[in-house]
């Protein structure tokens, strides 16, 4: 994950020789920030490419790859677009839809990301209701609802801009913001208290949770 790449880049205990056998690195699970990519590549001289997927997609769906030069035509085949999570794997499809109606959204516009392909899970074990919420059948084809918001460009590269499902990714772990809010409300036992949890970038863990409250949570009563 980018969190680990950043740790490797700044750690004096991880030498350049430690990763000399690698040809390239693929990062996923959280957003790859440009400063993390640059720090890692500067230290190890290994290119970093961003990919995308979920546990429900076993776990990959797309990836950026090194560009290929055609020596005969002197042209370069574009396979990497920094800032995106690459193109879909062979046999995998992305569909960008309205999150409510599931109607397709035009190229370049943001919407809910659906993933289709042979790697899509059959379902959550003994959880049919949760499975039904995650899997959409459209024209007899199974699609996984990622909960992520993004768009495809004209070349098929996917950009993720936000999450419909309210989670923070801290050190690569998914933390439900709704659960955080509920646990704090239960612990405070204050019927007048209102809390909203959100997340901000964090240089160490990728993201950090920030709480907005109608009262001072640190005060003693």
Regions found by a protein language model. Name each.
Residues 49-56, 86-88, 198-201:
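Beta-strand->loop->alpha-helix junctions that form or flank phosphate-binding loops
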Residues 3, 30-31, 119:
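Alpha-helix/helix-capping structural signal
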Residues 84-91, 103-135, 173-175:
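Conserved ATP/PPi-binding loop(s) of AMP-dependent carboxylate-activating enzymes
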Residues 45, 78-82, 120-147, 164, ...:
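Conserved ANL (AMP-binding/adenylate-forming) active-site segment centered on the GW(Y/F)…HTG consensus within
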Residues 9-80, 93:
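Gly/Ser/Thr-rich phosphate-binding loop
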Residues 117, 122-123, 149-221:
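AMP-binding/adenylate-forming catalytic core of the ANL superfamily
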Residues 29, 53, 86, 148, ...:
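Active-site glycine-centered loops adjacent to acidic/histidine catalytic or metal-binding residues
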């Amino acid at each position: 994950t980018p969190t680990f790449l950043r740790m490797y880049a700044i750690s004096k205990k991880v030498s350049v020789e430690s990763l000399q056998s690698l040809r390239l690195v693929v990062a996923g699970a959280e957003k790859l920030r440009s400063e993390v990519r640059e720090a890692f590549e500067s230290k190890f001289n290994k290119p970093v490419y961003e990919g995308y997927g979920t546990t429900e997609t076993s776990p990959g769906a797309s990836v950026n790859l090194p560009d290929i030069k055609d020596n005969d035509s002197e042209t370069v085949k574009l396979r990497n677009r920094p800032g995106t999570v690459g193109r879909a794997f062979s046999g995998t499809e992305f569909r960008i839809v309205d999150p409510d109606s599931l109607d397709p959204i035009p190229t370049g516009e943001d919407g809910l990301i659906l993933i289709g392909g042979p790697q899509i899970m059959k379902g959550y074990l003994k959880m049919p209701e949760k499975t039904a919420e995650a899997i959409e059948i459209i024209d007899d084809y199974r699609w996984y609802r990622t909960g992520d918001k993004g768009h495809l460009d004209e070349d098929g590269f996917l950009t993720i801009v936000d999450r419909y499902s309210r989670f923070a990714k801290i050190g690569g772990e998914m933390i439900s913001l709704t659960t955080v809010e509920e646990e704090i409300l239960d612990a405070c036992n204050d019927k007048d208290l209102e809390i909203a949890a959100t997340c901000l970038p964090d240089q160490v863990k990728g993201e950090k949770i920030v709480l907005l409250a109608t009262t001072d949570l640190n005060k003693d009563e």
